[in-house]
Amino acid sequence: MKGGQQAPSALRVVVADDHHHVLPEIHAAIRRRLVPFQGVHVLHFDAHPDLSFPRSVDPALVFEPHALYDALDESVSGIAEFLLPLVYAGHVNQLMWIKPQWATQRLCVSLPLLHFIEEDAYAAVDAMASETIKPWDFFITELPDRLPSVSTHAPSSAIVDGHDVLAQLQRKPAQAYILDIDLDYFSTWNPFRKDLEQRVGAATANIVAQVFTALRYRDMGNGMSIAARSQDRRSFVAALGQLEDQKATQANDPSVFDPSSLVYQSILNTLTPLYRDGVDAPDLLTKFMNLMGTLDHDARQLVWWAGPNLDLPHHMSSNDEIERMVAALRDFLVDIATTNGKSAHPPSLVTIAKSTGDEYLPPHQLEFVQSRVLRCLRDVFGDLDVEFVAYEDVQDAEDNANEE
């Protein structure tokens, strides 16, 4: 529903639930010349980097928007896969991820950060097709610490104010910038951990988390080469896949978890050297194998689904924390909207993801967070043209049509 008749100068704000559903609105803004075709910077406030791309999708779909939208809807992680298509298409040449202080996940592309290795998206420059390379600037930072009750602290490289961001934005010429806000920036659930703990308990979830996160390739300070990290990751995925397949085909046969079985020993021998120094891998893996042997099919499937995501941030903010973060956002936006006492351009477009459908934002906090963010935007930029975009699942739409 579109909010009323607005002055021509009103700032357009698009609000969707799933984050990737802002992509059609960005493309529409480009077509309407509200956003330039290229040279766009994105300020991305989010508890997650959202820099994935589905490996099964042909990159050519980046230039076929409707097919791309369908692919993202079908992808299990489509909400994290809407930004890189904008880079690959040449629209965005700089992205700044501004994260909350509890988002400690480490972030290819030719950038050998853990996020890209995990997503199997890293490639050395000389392994890329030269005509497809799209150079872009990427920054990660935080707003000043305004949450006294949060135990983590901003690193020394954290932003002091919006002028620091402006200096970074000016490193590369920009035609305009998009302000992109995921409301889970202000309060974050990890739905994977929450669902797993509810099903199998916190102690079991902790064992699963160690199996998936205590791996040496995830330690970016141990001197491993990128090739070795990538190989370790592939070995880990293959071994866990073997275990999953064995249990799927022998659902009622516990022998796959018998320490004397060849399958068990093969998987154990493959996985043990993949763990960090100081981790008792045989003991950890034995606990995990024993655990998996006691779970029913649905619980095992939950482990495979949740395991790779148990290190995602999880911090439900109090109302006071949220108010402080919104105040920090307001200060930040005022800083970048004013340069040397002169008014600077507002964003060409604001996109907001509610993220309550998948519960990355605790659903009961939506109204509180959303109302304060919109009020913040009005305080800084004046009139807003707010549109709430709703998307219906294709199958649901067909079912409803058949009922009619």
PLM feature spans:
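Conserved alpha-helical scaffold segments that buttress catalytic/binding sites
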Residues: 1-404
